[in-house]
């Protein structure tokens, strides 16, 4: 059986697409007072170090989050996603890429639940 190590792919174009959509979905859920439940059945690491040997092998993040990191003005939907990525990266440098749990966590209200497997 082949093993999958997300550290090689963290922050690539697919992660950006998936996590941008996740931000939009969670924001839509927050429009109502009703609580929401987030279940991640394939939760990996909470964050991925982009300077690691794994991430450096193919440097897939360069065609994903790195292209967006230093953009100036962006649409609100993209700005929300980038704000969440910035929470994981205090300072100006892009060093870490958040996994889905860290993408969702800043949006959670007291009544919402998150379960990671």
Give the residues covered by each predicted segment.
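Class I SAM-dependent methyltransferase Rossmann-like catalytic core
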Residues: 1-33, 49-63
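Short, conserved active-site loops that position catalytic residues or coordinate cofactors/metal ions
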Residues: 3-4, 40-45
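Generic structural signal for well-ordered secondary structure
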Residues: 15-19, 41, 97
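Gly/serine-rich nucleotide phosphate-binding loop at the start of the catalytic core
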Residues: 32-40
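Class I S-adenosyl-L-methionine-dependent methyltransferase module
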Residues: 36-37, 45-117
């Amino acid at each position: 059986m082949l093993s999958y190590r997300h550290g090689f792919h963290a922050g690539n174009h697919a992660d950006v697409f998936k996590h941008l959509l996740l931000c939009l979905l969670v924001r839509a859920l927050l429009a109502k007072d009703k609580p929401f439940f987030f279940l991640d059945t394939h939760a990996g690491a909470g964050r991925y170090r982009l300077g690691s040997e794994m991430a450096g092998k193919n440097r897939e993040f360069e065609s994903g989050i790195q292209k967006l990191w230093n953009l100036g003005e962006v649409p609100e939907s993209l700005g929300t996603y980038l704000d969440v990525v910035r929470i994981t990266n205090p300072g100006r440098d892009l060093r870490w890429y958040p996994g889905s749990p860290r993408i969702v966590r800043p949006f959670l209200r007291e009544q919402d639940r998150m379960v990671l497997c």
